[in-house]
Amino acid sequence: MYLITLLSTIVPILLAVAFLTLVERKILGYMQLRKGPNVVGPYGLLQPIADAVKLFTKEPLRPLTSSVSMFIIAPILALALALTMWTPLPMPHPLINMNLGILFMLAMSSLAVYAILWSGWASNSKYALIGALRAVAQTISYEVTLAIILLSILLMSGSYSLTTLITTQEYIWLILPSWPLTMMWFISTLAETNRAPFDLTEGESELVSGFNVEYAGGPFALFFLAEYANIIMMNALTTILFLGAYNNPMAPELYTTNFATKTLLLTMSFLWIRASYPRFRYDQLMHLLWKNFLPLTLALCMWYVTMPIMLASIPPQT
């Protein structure tokens, strides 16, 4: 039974990832006044399937000087972690209802750094290594603000469990009382998932393709799947944290529809941002975090800690 529930989560995620690639290419196409993929199937709808078949039937080449075991493990680890992070997400019922769901997700996203680092190092290529080091520095840096923002939100909800956030937001979305946090959270998720304008790891102009430059066929597809699964997961988490979907216990399907719509809109905004903005310079990326976001989030965290104490009240205990 547990295997069925696991598959009923993983299969739709992978399907969503497949069609997200198509949506991205379509949006970028129309924003650049062209059609995008429109040959395979009606309106290009079968393009993701054709891409998958092409990638997985290719020979998985690897450089002679590469470290074999790490080179193979890295993409598998990346996808495994990307899928593991979905377990505590309430949709409206999580796969595993964890008391420390948020902490688990932070730990998993930190582990994803290893997959990138190993892939860059095991490739034995200068470009891949520089791309991997950039990715690691960027991910670790932005995780600092993500953790502080999460702490501030949890102070409002009163529990580390994600399901409590649904109850907290019955009357008001947390985006309204904590909009500065929401803005910084959204920009940090862009950086965390290595998306434009923070896609320095894949800087085509200087690093060819970044940490996955030496990968071909299947392993490359696994990295690709992991990246897009992370994008959807981050937007799902944003929806749960700030745009709490309406939850009626009598009709849980309403929650799922509401949740999916908001996640889709946020994901579309990721693609819109990619089509609109140029890439940041590396030092600007770091300055934005360490000199702007970090002091601001720390100050706001202090504010959210002191407010209940000043008003002599505590958040609801669960």
UniProtKB/Swiss-Prot annotation:
CC terms in the record's Gene Ontology section: mitochondrial inner membrane
GO MF annotations in UniProt: NADH dehydrogenase (ubiquinone) activity
Membrane topology: Multi-pass membrane protein
Highest taxon above the source species: Eukaryota
Pfam families recorded: NADHdh (PF00146)
Function: Core subunit of the mitochondrial membrane respiratory chain NADH dehydrogenase (Complex I) that is believed to belong to the minimal assembly required for catalysis. Complex I functions in the transfer of electrons from NADH to the respiratory chain. The immediate electron acceptor for the enzyme is believed to be ubiquinone.
Record-given protein name: NADH-ubiquinone oxidoreductase chain 1
Organism: Phyllostomus elongatus (Lesser spear-nosed bat)
Phylogenetic placement of the source organism: Eukaryota, Metazoa, Chordata, Craniata, Vertebrata
Gene, per the UniProt record: MT-ND1
